[in-house]
């Protein structure tokens, strides 16, 4: 039902603009050819799409998937995607995945923190990690010739981290300060509230960082248990792009990740369902000069056929702030840019000329089996109703 609602929103977005393009083109327009419904650049765009490197995917015996795209570059990016985020946590251990990410680069049984930093620096590489609601990701950017070392470092980090008590206490303080910083970022606060009300009493409603009381109590045993429970072959994908040989990557995966545990008998536990609840939450503070608002409908999961149309609709609505001006088309403009400005800037023009908001940003957040499609905006309190009205009209 919700996906149908999102599809309806996408149709409402496209159809009026098709009509407006017909009216705007005119018989003498040399740029947009309405008769065929295509741009002259469509053939070139098709050729570019056909030139995308082939994606190769191979599974290991323990269930880990290996994926690559070889574009023949001199550099590469390789990362390990793990199904382990706040959606896989409960109220007691919420925040553990993010805490574990902080501990990733604090030393392993083979490398101290300093040794790891120096090795990455001497390679001219970049090592990083992040946690989302459904995944923890560790990745490295390096020269293609250093792919074997990059994969070995990633394997060492996730399998041999020392998780020292002193480092845990130090990172505990870092995370608590990070939480204070997040509270001052009103956009992040709004999106946490959006998830909390859209997915009430479900795992997707929890924050990634977790509550303060959990961060203060998480210990080494909690981190080890989380690794033991979630860092299994079927939950992982080793992916690389750039100057990457798939066969080489597959051999490296077998060497460094082949001993990871596979799924237990009976398979991995199913992902807990997260039902969408249409609702509203308002946090009022009259001392604040501006209102920060997010409006969303339930969208589709990553593998749903509606995902691509929703991504296109998200791009068409786009984003705007006052520094962009009113979206007036200047000459000369390419055919593609002209079309995008004609189609994508209507809401921006309304917001600008009506002085309805300071900024807005369309978003499409996808999860495994659900998602949120909507708009985030920053408005004066007196213009909220008008801005929401025009947003709904564009949908």
Predicted segments, located by residue:
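Charge-rich, well-structured scaffold segments of protease-associated domains
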Residues: 2-40, 53, 59, 106, ...
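Short loop/turn motifs at secondary-structure junctions and domain boundaries
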Residues: 47-50
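Short, surface-exposed, low-complexity cationic segments
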Residues: 73-86
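Short pre-active-site segment immediately N-terminal to the catalytic Zn-binding motif
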Residues: 84-94
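Active-site SXXK
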Residues: 95-108
């Amino acid at each position: 039902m919700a996906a149908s609602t999102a599809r309806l929103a996408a149709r409402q977005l496209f159809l009026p603009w098709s009509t407006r393009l017909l009216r705007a083109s005119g018989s003498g327009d040399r740029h947009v050819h309405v008769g065929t419904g295509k741009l002259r650049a469509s053939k070139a765009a098709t050729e570019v799409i056909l030139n995308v490197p082939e994606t190769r995917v191979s599974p290991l015996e323990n269930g880990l998937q290996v994926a690559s795209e070889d574009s023949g570059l001199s550099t590469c990016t390789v990362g390990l995607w793990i199904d382990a985020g706040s959606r896989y946590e409960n109220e007691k251990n919420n925040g553990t995945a993010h805490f574990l990410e902080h501990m990733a680069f604090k030393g392993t049984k083979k490398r101290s923190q300093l040794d790891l930093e120096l090795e990455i620096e001497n390679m001219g590489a970049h090592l990083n990690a992040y946690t989302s609601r459904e995944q923890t990701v560790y990745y490295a950017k390096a020269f293609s010739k250093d792919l074997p070392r990059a994969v070995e470092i990633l394997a060492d980090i996730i399998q041999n981290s020392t998780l020292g008590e002193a480092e845990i206490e130090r990172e505990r303080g870092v995370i608590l300060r990070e939480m204070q910083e997040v509270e001052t970022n009103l956009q992040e606060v709004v999106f946490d509230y959006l998830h909390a009300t859209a997915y009430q009493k479900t795992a997707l409603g929890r924050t990634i960082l977790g509550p303060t009381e959990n961060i203060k109590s998480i210990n080494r045993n909690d981190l080890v248990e989380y690794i033991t429970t979630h860092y299994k072959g079927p939950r992982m994908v080793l992916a690389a792009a750039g100057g990457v040989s798939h066969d080489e990557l597959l051999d490296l995966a077998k060497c460094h990740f082949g001993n990871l545990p596979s799924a237990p008998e009976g398979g991995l536990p199913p992902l807990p369902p997260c039902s969408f609840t249409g609702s509203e939450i308002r946090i009022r503070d009259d001392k604040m000069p501006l209102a920060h608002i997010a409006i969303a409908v339930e969208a589709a999961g990553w593998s749903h056929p509606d995902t691509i149309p929703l991504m296109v609709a998200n791009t068409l609505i786009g984003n705007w702030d006052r520094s962009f001006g009113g979206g007036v088309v200047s000459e000369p403009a390419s055919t593609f840019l002209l079309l995008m400005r004609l189609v994508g800037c209507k809401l921006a023009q309304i917001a600008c000329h009506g002085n309805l908001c300071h900024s807005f940003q369309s978003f499409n957040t996808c999860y495994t089996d659900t998602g949120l499609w909507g708009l985030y905006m920053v408005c004066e309190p007196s213009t909220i109703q008008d801005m929401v009205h025009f947003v709904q009209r564009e949908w």
